[in-house]
Amino acid sequence: MMFKQYLQVTKPGIIFGNLISVIGGFLLASKGSIDYPLFIYTLVGVSLVVASGCVFNNYIDRDIDRKMERTKNRVLVKGLISPGVSLVYATLLGIAGFMLLWFGANPLACWLGVMGFVVYVGVYSLYMKRHSVYGTLIGSLSGAAPPVIGYCAVTGDFDSGAAILLAIFSLWQMPHSYAIAIFRFKDYQAANIPVLPVIKGISVAKNHITLYIIAFAVATLMLTLGGYAGYKYLVVAAAVSVWWLGMALRGYKVEDDKVWARKLFGFSIIAITALSIMMSVDFMVPNSQNLLTYVW
């Protein structure tokens, strides 16, 4: 029973979703030549770091989680794990994850993990989520870290491919998160969380969703245009982007915003999963200069 509670507080669904993107970034960089020990170290390391961040987030958010319907039954809210124990647990998970990335992958992968962790826990969870409408934007940067870590674990470089991955996954996070905020509007309102739909209105959020999907579509194409992914990837990327954009545009005419937002959210998962799979299997050897080469 206790195992289940310690697992739940790490948010397994979030860990699984991040692992899909880590695999995408790792295999994109591997170009068919997979270092399996490195692959395992990277996956487990990122999983532990994400788990640590989620436990810290649960600790920080336990007051507002009580006010939200979807989070009122979380482990810390119900007192099934004490706050003090959760902090120790989160710290141990983080230390283990960072050590695996440092020694099992490379220092760059570890530092990227540290930066993503600090942004998520220190900047987003502790401050931006509660005080700024731009919290979602800041949070999107940490959400985009896992595929970049997977990529850089192989290359040891933060090159243009890594930058494109950062752009793709950051831009994807925005409509994905705004969709959640729309169909969970009352929850965010009750907890006084200043997400865009609550502060500026759902109609403004729809405009932002549309613009971010357009930007996302452009970013996805850059993997092929930059020589990192092939044309099969390009076709899938274009198809999911056009479909997702079409869903966003239909949102201007719907009668039930919550139903529409839930569908948009659901397709966002399909879209990013499809892209992660395609970049894993349809890769090209790039011919581009590094933006930043990490020398160790």
Curated annotation (Swiss-Prot):
It catalyses: heme b + (2E,6E)-farnesyl diphosphate + H2O = Fe(II)-heme o + diphosphate. One of its GO terms (molecular function) is protoheme IX farnesyltransferase activity. Residues 29-37, 98-107, 217-228, 288-296 are periplasmic. The keyword Ribosomal protein does not apply. It is a multi-pass membrane protein. InterPro entries: Protohaem_IX_farnesylTrfase, UbiA_prenyltransferase, UbiA_prenylTrfase_CS, UbiA_sf. The chain crosses the membrane at residues 10-28, 38-56, 79-97, 108-126, 198-216, 229-247, 269-287. Pathway: Porphyrin-containing compound metabolism; heme O biosynthesis; heme O from protoheme: step 1/1. It is an enzyme of class 2 (transferase). Disulfide bonds: none annotated. It holds the Pfam family UbiA. Residues 1-9, 57-78, 127-197, 248-268 are cytoplasmic. Its EC number is 2.5.1.141. GO terms for biological process: heme O biosynthetic process. It is found in: Cell inner membrane. Converts heme B (protoheme IX) to heme O by substitution of the vinyl group on carbon 2 of heme B porphyrin ring with a hydroxyethyl farnesyl side group. Carbon 2 of the heme B porphyrin ring is defined according to the Fischer nomenclature. Belongs to the UbiA prenyltransferase family. Protoheme IX farnesyltransferase subfamily. This is Protoheme IX farnesyltransferase. It comes from Salmonella typhi. The gene is cyoE.
